[in-house]
């Protein structure tokens, strides 16, 4: 395993640990999710470039599309929770009702 792959795996692991440890605030959870998606994007791009697999070259772009949708939904939930309750705790997501 090369050094760059190990660095990206460590970035993913640290983001996952941050997501598991700091679950109280929604903004920190969203930042950890974005770090995970960024490290996955870089790992997939490096793997495709190293293997010269041209048929799978669209997969990182599709991952970025899903990451953008996830970020938009997360930020809209953050705005909704913070305007309704005045704080961005994850536990307030259980109180949201239609």
Swiss-Prot record:
Main enzyme class: translocase
Membrane topology label: Multi-pass membrane protein
Gene Ontology biological process: ATP synthesis coupled electron transport
Keyword Mitochondrion: yes
Record-linked InterPro entries: NADH_UbQ_OxRdtase_chain4L/K, NUOK/Mnh_C1-like
Residue intervals passing through the bilayer: 1-21, 29-49, 61-81
A cellular-component GO term for this protein: respiratory chain complex I
Reactions this protein catalyses: a ubiquinone + NADH + 5 H(+)(in) = a ubiquinol + NAD(+) + 4 H(+)(out)
Localisation: Mitochondrion inner membrane
Keywords noted in UniProt: Electron transport, Membrane, Mitochondrion, Mitochondrion inner membrane, NAD, Respiratory chain, Translocase, Transmembrane, Transmembrane helix, Transport, Ubiquinone
Molecular function terms, GO-annotated: NADH dehydrogenase (ubiquinone) activity
Quaternary state and interactors: Core subunit of respiratory chain NADH dehydrogenase (Complex I) which is composed of 45 different subunits.
Role, per record: Core subunit of the mitochondrial membrane respiratory chain NADH dehydrogenase (Complex I) which catalyzes electron transfer from NADH through the respiratory chain, using ubiquinone as an electron acceptor. Part of the enzyme membrane arm which is embedded in the lipid bilayer and involved in proton translocation.
Entry similarity comment: Belongs to the complex I subunit 4L family.
Annotated protein name in UniProt: NADH-ubiquinone oxidoreductase chain 4L
Organism the protein comes from: Vampyressa melissa
Record lineage: Eukaryota, Metazoa, Chordata, Craniata, Vertebrata
């Amino acid at each position: 395993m090369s050094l760059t792959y190990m660095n990206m795996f460590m970035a993913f692991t640290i983001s996952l640990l941050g997501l598991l440890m700091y679950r109280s605030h929604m903004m920190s959870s969203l930042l950890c999710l974005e770090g995970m998606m960024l490290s996955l994007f870089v790992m997939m791009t490096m793997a495709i470039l190293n293997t010269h697999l041209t048929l799978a070259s669209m997969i990182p772009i599709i991952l970025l599309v899903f990451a953008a949708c996830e970020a938009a939904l997360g930020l809209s939930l953050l705005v909704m929770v913070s305007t309704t309750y005045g704080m961005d705790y994850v536990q307030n997501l259980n109180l949201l009702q239609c």
